[in-house]
Amino acid sequence: MSSALANIYARLPVSFTHGRGVWLWDTGERRYLDALAGIGVSCLGHGHPGLVAAISEQAARLIHTSNIYEVPQQAALARRLAELSGMSEVLFSNSGSEANEAAIKLARYYGYKQGNTHAHIITMDSSWHGRTLATLAATGSDKARQGFGPMPSGFIQVPYNDLPAIRAAGEAEPRVTAVLLEVLQGEGGIRPSDMAFLRGVRQLCTERGWLLMIDEVQSGIGRTGKWFAHQWADIRPDVMTLAKGLAGGVPIGAMLAAGPAAGVFAPGSHGTTFGGGPLACAAGLAVIDAIEQEGLLANAHEVGAHLHAALASELAGVPGIIEVRGHGLMLGIELDRPCGILATRAMEAGLLINVTRERVVRLLPPLILSGEEADQIVRILVPLIKQFLAQQQ
């Protein structure tokens, strides 16, 4: 491809021209089963009629004005998200990083209003919250931060799924104002949190007057079989961030606030040029409509359970397999060794996946995936994994 592009991606040697459903076609008209969905973005697959119509109609009418004016599509999407989540207010942006940046700013401003001029946020090891400096500082990855110091201060990282560690961190640092975590770590290797842990963190935050901030950028919008993954624990955060699947491929992010976090920001506290524009919000409304009308929450739960069970059965007892894990259509297969080459081999076999944390095969197929298509994933992927492990003995 063009040498004018910045060299920041290790791209696979394929270009796609069009897609339909869970399928993509390359420049040579070869078909691929897309089990990655643009890293969890294309939740309705490709070429979804309702989404295409909403984008086309809105683009023909109006693409952009400004947040200095009323934006009806933005207000409508905010209402829908508030209804689905039980949250009170929504701030739109353009990406997950921006949504998490807004959450970090809100937590600090929340502390500032209480007289805490150096608010601290507790985050988790192996977490991922974005590539801006503040979200990198919050992210539990030394590798991602390497070379970009000095990092913003005010972040305390503790082991994931470890409630006593969070409690101890708060006792050691009296300036803590918030806890930021993922219900299901994506870049961290598809690591689910314990439901008891989530409920315990919710209770601890309430007791200590901290904000519970949940990053649902990858796990939200139906991916686990509920609108938001934290709903499996029957809790409500004070702050939630969304992006990826929210508009089915059109760039968007959102930060939702409730309880003590609602009303913290005022005019001038934060802002965005493009966030919550008419086009992105029209797409977001179409995504929510499609998920509701097509029963995609149930589909993600049921087909995801089928895919999980099939992979676990086929890989049971295979030397080198650590675990098949995840929830809904957010699944990971952990191997005992680095396996990045599997993304290339799967692509060569007509299946799109990726590998995170060096040794976890990640699957994030569209929510429209059928049982038959899930079986196709298994038929392609399992032999590739077995062959790879046998060659590495």
Swiss-Prot record:
<feature type="binding site">
    <location>
        <position position="273"/>
    </location>
    <ligand>
        <name>pyridoxal 5'-phosphate</name>
    </ligand>
</feature>
<keyword id="KW-0808">Transferase</keyword>
<dbReference type="InterPro" id="IPR050103">
    <property type="entry name" value="Class-III_PLP-dep_AT"/>
</dbReference>
<keyword id="KW-0663">Pyridoxal phosphate</keyword>
<comment type="similarity">
    <text>Belongs to the class-III pyridoxal-phosphate-dependent aminotransferase family. ArgD subfamily.</text>
</comment>
<protein>
    <recommendedName>
        <fullName>Acetylornithine aminotransferase 1</fullName>
        <ecNumber>2.6.1.11</ecNumber>
    </recommendedName>
</protein>
<feature type="binding site">
    <location>
        <position position="272"/>
    </location>
    <ligand>
        <name>N(2)-acetyl-L-ornithine</name>
    </ligand>
</feature>
<comment type="pathway">
    <text>Amino-acid biosynthesis; L-arginine biosynthesis; N(2)-acetyl-L-ornithine from L-glutamate: step 4/4.</text>
</comment>
<comment type="subunit">
    <text>Homodimer.</text>
</comment>
<dbReference type="InterPro" id="IPR015424">
    <property type="entry name" value="PyrdxlP-dep_Trfase"/>
</dbReference>
<dbReference type="InterPro" id="IPR015422">
    <property type="entry name" value="PyrdxlP-dep_Trfase_small"/>
</dbReference>
<keyword id="KW-0032">Aminotransferase</keyword>
<dbReference type="GO" id="GO:0005737">
    <property type="term" value="C:cytoplasm"/>
</dbReference>
<dbReference type="GO" id="GO:0003992">
    <property type="term" value="F:N2-acetyl-L-ornithine:2-oxoglutarate 5-aminotransferase activity"/>
</dbReference>
<dbReference type="InterPro" id="IPR004636">
    <property type="entry name" value="AcOrn/SuccOrn_fam"/>
</dbReference>
<dbReference type="InterPro" id="IPR015421">
    <property type="entry name" value="PyrdxlP-dep_Trfase_major"/>
</dbReference>
<keyword id="KW-0028">Amino-acid biosynthesis</keyword>
<dbReference type="Pfam" id="PF00202">
    <property type="entry name" value="Aminotran_3"/>
</dbReference>
<dbReference type="GO" id="GO:0030170">
    <property type="term" value="F:pyridoxal phosphate binding"/>
</dbReference>
<keyword id="KW-0963">Cytoplasm</keyword>
<feature type="binding site">
    <location>
        <position position="131"/>
    </location>
    <ligand>
        <name>N(2)-acetyl-L-ornithine</name>
    </ligand>
</feature>
<dbReference type="GO" id="GO:0006526">
    <property type="term" value="P:L-arginine biosynthetic process"/>
</dbReference>
<dbReference type="InterPro" id="IPR049704">
    <property type="entry name" value="Aminotrans_3_PPA_site"/>
</dbReference>
<keyword id="KW-0055">Arginine biosynthesis</keyword>
<dbReference type="InterPro" id="IPR005814">
    <property type="entry name" value="Aminotrans_3"/>
</dbReference>
<dbReference type="GO" id="GO:0042802">
    <property type="term" value="F:identical protein binding"/>
</dbReference>
<feature type="modified residue" description="N6-(pyridoxal phosphate)lysine">
    <location>
        <position position="244"/>
    </location>
</feature>
<feature type="binding site">
    <location>
        <begin position="215"/>
        <end position="218"/>
    </location>
    <ligand>
        <name>pyridoxal 5'-phosphate</name>
    </ligand>
</feature>
